[in-house]
Amino acid sequence: MLDTISESRPNGLATLGVVVATFATYLALKALYNLYLHPLRKFPGPKLAAIGPYYEFYYDVMKDGMFLWEMERMHQVYGPIVRVNANEIHIRDPHYYSTVYAGNHRSTDKYHDAVAAFSVPQASLATIHHKVHRLRRSILNPYFSKAAVTRLESAINERIERMCSRLEETMHYGQVVDLDAGFAALTADIVTTYFYGQNFDYLGNEGFKFQVRDAILGLIQFYHFTRFFPWIANTIKKLPIPIMRLIHPGAAYLVSSQEEIKDSIRASLDKGNKADAKSVIVQALEDPTIPPQERTLDRLGDEGTTIIFAGTETTARALSVGMFHILNNKTILKKLREELDTLPGVSSGVYSHVQLECLPYLTGAVQESLRLSHGPAIRLPRVANDKALKYGDYIIPPGTPVSLCTVLVHQDPCIFPDPHRFDPERWVKASKEGVNLDKFIAAFTKGTRQCLGINLAYAEIYLTFAKLIRTFNMEIYDTTVDDLTVHHIRLTGAPKQGTGEVKVKVTEKIL
């Protein structure tokens, strides 16, 4: 028996050696192919990035979302078009943005490797193929059109009033307010009520804290890791909730809360209860014109998960960044109040966003808030399958993932001089001179894959700014520009230290 065991050990080691050698040979051959035979072999860029995902993995996973700044360095060395990994081209040219993020004139897919980490394969946001995406977006577009958002305006204003009453409470008690948490509660209340027909009143929670947001923020921390290893996230998602809770409590809470919402909707539908008739998900589930496979509760639940994230954290951050800069510059605050005072017959501070969109200085403040908060800060590659793209002397083969980074577009000094300065006046001046700066706001991306909730987000930002600016005096508390400066690129931008929340004290109610 001992002889048998001793013989099996060398055999086992030999087998392991063969496996390791085979895998190493595969990696070496793959690297050689990527360097010398790959269709992108002639594009400029560092050889280390071209051999595979290792270079990007080091900067984004090991160094916590720093690959963007390495890409910026690459562009300084190699020019405006760079091969940033084995398969992807990155372009640093804001004028080329609308070519990559194209409209209906071209079929544009998403890149599988870029959306796999989201673990919501049936959501529009994670849908790869152009035709499937167009079908899924056509289902939801009517609910997020400008007309639909206008009909939703009273509900938005009701939640803003609720936030104002909470802010007034903090004023009486001299409490510090985390605006990021407050605005996240506001936007989450609006989007969950509209999409699911259920008002969770996150604004009523102490400190505006709610577990769904904590879960989302926790998942953002792991975005890059799950981007390289999506199978891990998908495996965790399939585990029973008690086991999932041991591994990742935030993910467990998010999944369990979504299941509770689904159960509530099932019960409502089974009873023929029309109380939720205005919710997006119930209307979609009951719409016979939608193909059956596209109106299942699981698929629309995936849509809801992405809408809660996209409709909560990014809009909330734009509001926080904007309020910081407005409060930090008394001249800007004064100009905004004077402009709001020009609106006729508004004594209560309750506005229509159609009115507010006509105010040039406020519009400039809204656009600067979006520009300096960036929205999703990650690369979002697009794939033109049916045609080659041309950039300068380079022909980009069909099927190649191509991206531009929002942060680099928003901080381009040729488009936005002194790009880190919050300057609503630049938009007023551009409008007077007939210059279209709007096309360089990429917070919602562009083209057929543009963010579904763009109209809702703009309405929320306009209405919230107007109400808070006219209702309260506030002072910034223990927050500096460094807290807003993007250093780490996770799913959204993050500062060098901490979480970068904007804190204020409400000192006076003036309306």
From Swiss-Prot:
Set out the biological process GO terms recorded for this chain's protein.
terpenoid biosynthetic process
- What's its top-level EC category? oxidoreductase
| Pathway in which the depicted protein is active | Secondary metabolite biosynthesis; terpenoid biosynthesis
List the catalytic activities from the record.
(1R,4R,5S)-acoradiene + 2 reduced [NADPH--hemoprotein reductase] + 2 O2 = 2,6,9-trimethyl-13-oxatetracyclo[6.3.1.1(6,9).0(1,5)]tridecane carbocation + 2 oxidized [NADPH--hemoprotein reductase] + 3 H2O + H(+)
Supply the InterPro entries for this chain.
Cyt_P450 (IPR001128), Cyt_P450_E_grp-I (IPR002401), Cyt_P450_sf (IPR036396), Cytochrome_P450_monoxygenase (IPR050121)
Disulphide connectivity of cysteines: none
Localization, UniProt: Membrane
Membrane topology value? Single-pass membrane protein
This enzyme's EC code(s):
1.-.-.-
Under what name is this protein listed? Cytochrome P450 monooxygenase flvD
Q: Could you tell me the gene encoding this protein?
A: flvD
